[in-house]
């Protein structure tokens, strides 16, 4: 009888338990502060905001029941608004015996976070890796589809490993480089100088974000060795040969382990060295983003006349290549049908043309940018879609509309603003159908969509001066930092003592248990995607099992590359958002 009562009471407690979800990094003093609570039974007790130092209640937040859908096995959701509290300190939410984790309210809560994101970027470096202090992939690579004979050596060492694997893609590296440069241009006083150009400790008089962006620019210059050539990918999925350290790469492309890797030249035509062929119609997606990066590099390195001139010339020639071969080039695969399926390019050429006009004053670039903007409008954006293939609508933030905005008349400005706002409203409509008010579809790399949506909201505010979507922006940021069903940040090591991805899908963790902070993991995916991917096998019982539902899953597990693999471009693509809140 006692055992029966114990089980009954335990079951009741678990049913009645209230879970709190907050931004673990914390809340800035003057911003809206809205947490989520959920339970399997109605919340009948009051909720208190408690000062963590004194354990005294400072506010009884009004409890607002959320009726716009539930999430998984929990039926009752509530919003807890404590925006009126602005006193700096550490706090927690409490209802009965249930408490949230402690979180701060303050002024400089995001200081240091960009440094962590840049540290993750440094550990993704190829050629020389300062995190590991090793040299790797010095034999990149042997040419394919180039103007020379196949398997001719071309020096394309450097750049970044793309994710947990060790491939290098111009698709993602061009965006990461340009995003960092644009972020610095918008927030020039927000970045520290703690490392040198090689990523080793010690200031060198250059903000670390520019050191990292130049690492990207140097590689972009290598893969555009002459006006008619552009290398778009180094290695392929033959890299996926188990966990390995970058300086001891056992993948074999036909020349032995730890040796040469293929360097694919962009031709604007389908490619593939196996049975899986990519789709391609041109090279404009790559050329446009590279042109934007080079033009920004030429402006930001004015003090280095030789380097600035190289960037300026490269911007012009690669942009011309994009006009000569209009269309898109996708990634290549050999072993499996998984690749970057990008098939948009008007947005990239718009951005490249707009930056070239800013650099040169040549009106032909402005005319091009306006033409591409009208063609891109919202057609190139995931924000007005419910589903799409992996990376088909890349990049996930169209900087082109923002850059062009200051260069055109008011009527054209209104068009550009409307393109951004149409996407924002579409995602907001989706957000209003779930209790966390998250606005993205849970496709592969949903976290990249989220950081990009935050970026679009920030740029819209800069374009228009309107803060009408500011609360929505905060909720997207907060999701990435813990205000989600699993209560976890989506960045490794952030915040330091919080719940964050630990068992990330990388060789560094698998072989060395090395936890490098700052990496944005892929994030939650639809169960329909997760269940149909090849090679996923959880290594441990699911710690978040209670919070999964039948539609969307996330696992902090080394074996889940679909949700817990950190990506280079997603991490770089978060810097705009993080800089905004510094």
What are these regions (language model features)?
Residues 198-209:
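Acidic, glycine-anchored loop motifs typical of Ca2+
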Residues 17-25:
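Short, compositionally biased P/S/T/A/G/V-rich stretches that sit at domain boundaries
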Residues 1-17:
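Bacterial Sec-dependent N-terminal signal peptides
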